[in-house]
Structures are given as C-alpha cells and as structure tokens.
Amino acid sequence: MEENKRKSLENALKTIEKEFGKGAVMRLGEMPKLQVDVIPTGSLGLDLALGIGGIPRGRVTEIFGPESGGKTTLALTIIAQAQKGGGVAAFVDAEHALDPLYAKKLGVDVQELLVSQPDTGEQALEIVELLARSGAVDVIVVDSVAALVPKAEIEGEMGDQHVGLQARLMSQALRKLTAVLSKSNTAAIFINQVREKVGVMYGNPETTPGGRALKFYSSVRLDVRKSGQPIKVGNEAVGIKVKVKVVKNKLAPPFREAELEIYFGRGLDPVMDLVNVAVAAGVIEKAGSWFSYGEHRLGQGKEKAAEYLRERPELLEEIRAKVLERADKVVLAAGEEEGE
C-alpha cells in the first residue's frame, strides 16, 4: 500500500476508534477469536452434522418442524449442556407450556433456569434483548415464534385483520438482536412450527410463522421431525426416532443429517447416541444383533451394549475419541441420501 493511502487509512481507523470505541474496526487477522464458540447439543451425531461441534454462540438458531417432533426436547437438552458447562440459561415460554418436571429429567437445573412467560410478542422479544445485553446469559430459548402474538392483535377484537403484524415485529426485533447477540456471545434459539400454505399445488406447501426475517437472520436452521416407527422394547413403545436436517448453516456445509433417539420421560440418551454414531463410523462393529469393539463384546442388542459402556467410562471415552478422529465418515453416512 502506498504511504499516503496507509496514513489516510490509519487516520480513519483512529477516528472510528475514538468515535465508536476500541475494536469497532479491525483487521481480520487481528481479531481475538476466529474460532466459533459453541454449546454442545447433547448428541454427538448432531454436533458432527453441524460441523462446528454444537449450536453457535453469538448467533441465532431456528429449530422448526411439525408438532411433537422433539423440538422443545432438543432445546432443553442444549440448555442442560450449557448449564453443565457453568453457563446461565433462559427460557422464554411464550406458549406457557414448559413442564419443569420433564425439563429436570432432561438434565436441566430448574432451580437456576431463568423463565419468563410474557403476555405479548413485543414483551417477549424485549426480554430476550435485555437478557442478551446483560452479557451474563449464555443461551436464550424462545418457545415458540407462533406464540409471539403482537400487542395490537391481543388487544383487538375477534375477527380483526392483523395482516403482517407478526412478520414486522420479528423483522424489527431481529435487526437489533443480531448485533446484541454477537457482542454478548449469547446463543439465541427460536423454536418454530410448520404450517401448510393453502392452495399450493407444486413445490413444498410447508411454511414457518413469523415471516422471512427469522430465516434470513438465522445462522443455523434445523428441521426436526419424526422418522420411521417408534422405538419399542417388546410391544411397548419407549421412544421416537427423530431426523434432524441442517437446512441452513453459515458456519459449515449445510444439508447434513443426524438421527436422534428420544426416549419418553428421559429424552436423549448420550450413550445410546454414541453407540449409533460409533457404528456409523466403523468404530463399533455390529454383526446381527451383537455389538463389539476390538476384543470387547459389548452385548446383544443396543441397550446391552450401552449398559456395558456406562459401566466402563474409560472405554466410553476411548470410543468417543476414535469417533471424533473419523468424523468425516459419520457425516458421509448421515448425508448419503443427499448424494444418491
């Protein structure tokens, strides 16, 4: 760079720094953190599918899908992981449907969880912004976008038309919120439902409430829905299989998938999840119904194999380390359908 240009740039940078504070503009190579901070999801398979090891801090994540598909369970599991790491979590319960007993079974420290049950969409989003601005909250979950009803709609008469109010509310809030989250390094997770557009003959009839702003401002979007038959022990259904597809990812390649197993009453089982991922990576061998790792015969059936590993934490960690070494194989196995 020419000397005159360099001096002009330095003067401009000094003026900006004086006006807006230190660090307002800096060279990318001088940035203190190029690595993305994350909160683990509680599922190794999903962490690998995300490509960064979890849900990104300082950004917006959208978890959407049909009802009873595991969206809230996944969000509460992420809260539990944040708390295990010494973090502070908040749950904005716009649906007024949070079950503290179920949250506790998923590993959430309900005594320390910050909970808000706002009356209007404006109130909910203002609470999210104020919590993020504090810089003391690690993750904020909003359940759900569909329940963020604008004040004008609540105070209006039944049958009044309020076209586009919620979309405008979300757009205004997210414009401010994204900058606040980035500075405070807070992860914001918005849970959303899917609706069907009336009269769509071609293409995907599904849409999500809240307009386009959330799709645009989200760094990660996860499509969560049931897949296949329920998990059964004998004739009794004990859980559901859930497919999570990363439909948008600004931080790693998108369109990767992970299959989770959610058990009724206890949610995600991390050991069972590890067994599934280790089989996909070729670390654990499966012959018929028998599972084995090297010289260790883990057991007949996945439940027995998981039980064997729970009793041997050192072996469990050894398998986890080998799975992480072969992460590419797991991602390839999860995304095979895309490449067919």
UniProtKB/Swiss-Prot annotation:
PROSITE patterns attached to this UniProt entry: RECA_1, RECA_2, RECA_3
Major location category of this protein: cytoplasm
Protein keywords: ATP-binding, Cytoplasm, DNA damage, DNA recombination, DNA repair, DNA-binding, Nucleotide-binding, SOS response
GO (cellular component) term, any one: cytosol
Single Gene Ontology MF annotation: single-stranded DNA binding
GO biological-process terms attached to the record: DNA recombination; DNA repair; SOS response
Binding site for ATP: G65, P66, E67, S68, G69, G70, K71, T72
Top-level lineage group: Bacteria
InterPro entries hit by this protein: AAA+_ATPase, DNA_recomb/repair_RecA, DNA_recomb/repair_RecA_CS, P-loop_NTPase, RecA-like_C, RecA-like_N, RecA_ATP-bd, RecA_C_sf
Compartments it resides in: Cytoplasm
Assigned protein family: Belongs to the RecA family.
Function: Can catalyze the hydrolysis of ATP in the presence of single-stranded DNA, the ATP-dependent uptake of single-stranded DNA by duplex DNA, and the ATP-dependent hybridization of homologous single-stranded DNAs. It interacts with LexA causing its activation and leading to its autocatalytic cleavage.
The protein, known as: Protein RecA
